[in-house]
Amino acid sequence: GGLAATRGDQIGIQVIKGLMARVPQLKPEDVDDLIVGCAFPEAEQGMNYGKVLAVGAGLPEPVSGMTVNRFCSSGVQSIADATAKIRAGWSDVIIAGGCETMSHIPMGGSIFRPNPDWKFGEQPNVYVSMGITAENVAANHGISREDMDAFGLESNRRAFEAIKAGKFKE
C-alpha cells in the first residue's frame, strides 16, 4: 500500500497530533499516559514505543509512555489497560491504541529465539500467532477462507449498525 515505506512512529505521531487537534479543549499537559500496543516492538517500533510517540507528538515530558505487547491483540490490550487505570482512579486522561507498520518487521520478528530450555514442540502454543491460529481453526473445523471473510464482514456490518443506532453511547 501507499504507506508501506512509512515508519510506524511517523504514522502514530501524526495520529496523536490529529487527535489532539480534534479535541482542542484537551491540553497536552492533561494527558496522564500514552499506552501503545505493538505486536513486534523492535527496530523503529522498539525502545519504549509509547514514550517515543508521546515525545514525537509534542506531549510534555511528564506524560509517561508504555508499550504493550500481546501480539495481535496489543492495541486492544492497551485500551483495556487504559480503561482499567481510569476506572481505578489512577488516571484521568490516557491516549491508547495500537501502532505498527508490519511492512517494516519480518513476520515473526527480526530473529526468532525460542526458549532454549524447552524442546521445540514441547510448548506448541507459546509461539503461535493469530495468523497461524486462524489457519489451525480453518483446518481443524473445516472453515473456509470465504466463511471467515463473510463472518468478519457481517461482524463489521453489525458493529456499524449498532454505532448508527447509538448502542455504544453512554
Locations of regions flagged by a protein language model:
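Thiamine diphosphate
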Residues: 40
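Acyl-thioester C-C bond-transforming condensing/cleaving domain
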Residues: 2-28, 43-47, 54-170
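Short glycine-rich phosphate-binding loop at a beta-alpha junction
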Residues: 29-37
